[in-house]
Amino acid sequence: ECQDPHVIFNIHGGNNLIAPNASQAEQKVEAKPADELKNKIRNNQERRPMDLQVQRFSDIDLNDPFFDSLRASYPEFNEWYNKKAAAGATAYCYYVDNELKDFLYLKIEEEELSDLIPVLPAKKRLKVGTFKVDNEDRHTTRGERFMKKIMDKAIAEDVDEIYVTMFPTEELRKLVTMFEKFGFSHIADKKHEDGSSEYVLVKDMRTQVNDLMFDYPFVRKAGSRKYVLSINPEYHTKLFPDSILKTEQKYDLIQDVSETNSIYKIYICWMRGVKELKKGDKLIIYRTNDYKGSAAYRSVCTSVCTVCEVKTITDFADEDAFVKYTNRYSVFGEEELRGWYKNKDYFTVIKMVYNIAFTKKVINKVMKERVGLNPRYWGFFRLTDVQFDKLLELGEINERYIVD
């Protein structure tokens, strides 16, 4: 088995590669009749324009040009890949118009990491193996979406740590920075026979430092206020793709845009009271009625977010500053944003972190009957700690996400 991860993060059209013993050798596998049949079946399967899915290695075409950079950097890549395929390994795959764009392989380990300096003792860890994100468009943030998948997997498996190894090259600085932003620290090194050395970046999943991003995705309840924030259906799914309702047409609604893929979200609204939000406040996202049925069953709580910052029009020097701040992570287009800046002087801009999707959506009827909620205004209202906890319970949130 390959002991080193292959991590590629193609940022803004550049090719940033992490892999041991870089070589320019290309090793495409020779197609066999069985492979050809499998590929034909795979290619004939209907896949929507934007598709994030879990696939077996054996169901992915190893001859896909997507893997050429990995073959070029790691001569044994095909051998490693075939071993994973034979073992039934799976990976997160992201397709755009039927073309493989992103690939994430994660692995659970429990042994001592004896090949590192210093040696890391045996613990249950999630290893980030292959991480390749092809960001050809400067405005996409699919790397953040994979980061959320890494965190969610770590929570689901109840690991002690997450780790990834990478070479500390200038080209990889942005990738290192992204991991560090989410609480990974350089605590060890991995030496190679050719004299090269990789950073070992580790995130401790058992310790929080009361920092919004370092502690991500954990939700710290103590010392924070809790609210319900309503969002209309046409905006909700674009902002929170993991919180999609079964009745919504996922692939018709979700596009490859930064607000869909990012951990950060920006929402602009005119609801009374929201400008009083502060950093660290917790938000239960409430998808309002789509008018395809009674609000009692169609309006639902779907997600938990944490407020990063709140701004009003007076916080922006000019229109361009407003558009620059909001355009990347909001669901609104530039023309729409500019129009609002010119015509509205009382909107509120909420920047938040997307922590958790509810496992079970909590409908309006249950909110009333089980939580005792019946505010005069459903757009935005405050929760007691007891009500917040009850919504998390009804939403079947994994308790590992919650820090008291």
What label would you give each PLM region?
Residues 294-306:
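Short coil-to-beta-strand transition motifs
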Residues 36-46, 153, 159-160, 164, ...:
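Contiguous surface segments at macromolecular interaction interfaces
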Residues 43-87, 93, 235-257:
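Short amphipathic alpha-helix that is part of the acyltransferase structural core
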